[in-house]
């Protein structure tokens, strides 16, 4: 989140699936030109607003479905220059993986279409059954469908307080891809 604050400085930031505003608040504290956080959960949005007030940062929080919000945004002139996609777990187990991957592909496609030219994307997954390679495949598919050139410049994972058990690779459930995005 601290790294995001540096990248967000002076830019318009959209945090989709913001939950309680963690990424959005760091972007605002880092000097983003504007910050909007979107989440479907009414209580999470109320908490995000309280967190912004407690941290004395300016951020706008909207209760909305992230997929729908991104669809509407793709028709707007002023698009985010930095986009964070940090959805809840789309696949809880192997039986849900195919549907979860479809949702990751769709969310990333909508995000890429909504992002400003030469934008930055941080896309995340907290699904243990979705590997880093799976997330890369979803982003690759989304980029092709959105007609975007996506250059991943960083892979990141869990902090030391989220250890991985060697016998259970799904315990390495947090993963994130950082990318630059251009229209083809």
Set out the residue ranges of the language-model regions.
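Class I SAM-dependent methyltransferase "Motif I" SAM/SAH-binding loop
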Residues: 17-21, 126
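S-adenosyl-L-methionine
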Residues: 43-84
């Amino acid at each position: 989140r601290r790294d995001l604050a540096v990248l967000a400085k002076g830019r318009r930031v959209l945090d989709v699936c913001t939950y309680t505003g963690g990424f959005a608040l760091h972007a605002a504290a880092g000097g983003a030109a504007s910050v909007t956080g979107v989440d479907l959960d009414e209580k999470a949005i109320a908490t995000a607003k309280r967190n912004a007030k407690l941290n004395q940062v300016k951020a706008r929080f909207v209760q909305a479905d992230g997929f729908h919000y991104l669809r509407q945004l793709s028709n707007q002139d002023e698009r985010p220059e930095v986009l964070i996609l940090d959805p809840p777990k789309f696949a809880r187990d192997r039986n849900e993986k195919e549907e979860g991957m479809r949702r990751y592909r769709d969310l990333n496609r909508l995000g890429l279409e909504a992002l400003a030219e030469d934008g930055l994307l941080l896309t995340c997954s907290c699904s243990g059954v979705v590997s880093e390679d799976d997330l890369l495949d979803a982003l690759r598919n989304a980029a092709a469908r959105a007609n975007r050139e996506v250059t991943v410049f960083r892979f990141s994972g869990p902090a030391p307080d989220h250890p991985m058990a060697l016998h259970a690779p799904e315990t390495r459930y947090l993963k994130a891809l950082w990318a630059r995005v251009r229209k083809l």
